[in-house]
A protein has these predicted regions:
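A nucleotide- and high-energy phosphate-metabolite-utilizing enzyme signature
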Residues: 2-334
């Protein structure tokens, strides 16, 4: 008999609400403990090998790989849905769904390396945005970043196209970009949305050396950026988003993701914390004492982000010397 989320909290050293902040790691821990099974990657690799061991045409091999991948995706999603209906733990679902897609993409990249192009990928395939954060709802977009080598070849582009067309043919909604490390840094400096997405990137497959270079270069770049510009941009973005959804926390039918006090407000607090305090992980935000209400294990009594913003705005003052002279009053306090 499986334990409910609340029962699990009683036997875990890490509070349930903290585990929910890192669903990808939560599910990884469950995998290592043998408590959850998503995709048998070894069996997937063996079945792919069988496809390419025959004398089929390349077109037939691709069709067989696509068919196999569809079966794995469908079976995996059905298992995740059954687990959600049984345990009622949304954090486990979004983390497990992200890992399912990780493993599916990893299998496709391996197939391309071993059988289609017969060479290792020279790019790093990174998950970014919410997928990079390890949270993938049933109909969420899959945001991918192909970090290309500085001197890329035509074969690199063909490799990328093979992966993308396989994912599209699987019916997945994929957002993607292909840039070198230096192009990513330049784009982050020009576009706050790209910069935000890179805060949550992680490597799925491909060239480890390229992914490590991307991560270290971005981290070094952030270190020398004035935090004030990013903070102001994200708060302005939040104000515009609130205005689009009525600008009130008392809506009869609130948008729980983008409305005032919704999930995106919490994401914004973490993004600002990670950028301004140069932190790699959401748990580092709690460890640094930035969001003290969260560290105590509860949100402010009001049904909005106002209390959180108040706590955060006080702490962020320490880094304003790098940008704006004073922290403006959060619009949630008006």
């Amino acid at each position: 008999m499986s334990l409910s989320p609340i029962q699990m909290e009683k036997v875990s050293a890490v509070p349930l609400w903290q585990r929910w902040l890192s669903p990808h790691e939560l599910v990884r821990d469950k995998q290592r403990a043998g408590k959850i099974h998503i995709l048998d990657t070894q069996l997937f690799a063996e079945e792919i090998s069988t496809i390419y061991s025959g004398k089929q045409t390349k077109s037939d091999q691709r069709a067989a790989l696509l068919s196999l991948s569809k079966v794995k995706l469908t079976e995996g999603r059905k298992a995740l849905e059954a687990g959600l209906m049984r345990d009622r733990d949304g954090a486990v679902y979004v983390g497990a769904h992200a890992i399912l897609i990780d493993q599916l993409i990893g299998g496709l990249v391996a197939a391309a390396e071993n059988y289609v192009f017969e060479t290792k990928a020279r790019f790093a395939l990174m998950a970014v945005g919410g997928y990079g954060r390890g949270e993938l709802a049933p109909l969420s977009d899959i945001d991918l970043l192909f970090v290309m080598p500085q001197r890329h070849k035509k074969s690199d582009a063909e490799f990328v196209e093979f992966i993308l067309y396989m994912l599209w043919d699987l019916g997945l909604v994929v957002g993607h970009a292909s840039r070198t490390v230096h192009q990513n840094i330049a784009a982050a400096g020009e576009d706050i949305t790209i910069c935000t997405s890179l805060l949550e990137m992680r490597c799925i497959a491909g060239a480890t050396a390229v992914s490590e270079q991307m991560l270290s270069t971005f981290k070094h770049w952030v270190t020398y950026q004035p935090a004030g510009h990013f903070v102001e941009a994200k708060l302005a973005e939040r104000d515009q988003r609130h205005a689009r959804f009525g600008g009130t926390r008392y809506a009869v039918e609130p948008n729980v993701k983008d409305g005032k006090g919704g999930l995106r407000d919490l994401h914004t607090l973490f993004w600002i914390s990670k950028y301004a305090y140069r932190l790699d992980h959401v748990r580092g935000v709690l460890g640094a004492g930035i969001l003290r209400h969260l560290k105590r294990g509860h949100l402010p009594p009001r049904n909005d982000s106002c209390g959180l913003c108040g706590v955060f705005c006080i702490n962020i003052m320490a880094v304003r010397m790098t940008g704006l002279p004073l922290m403006r009053k959060c619009s949630s306090h008006r």
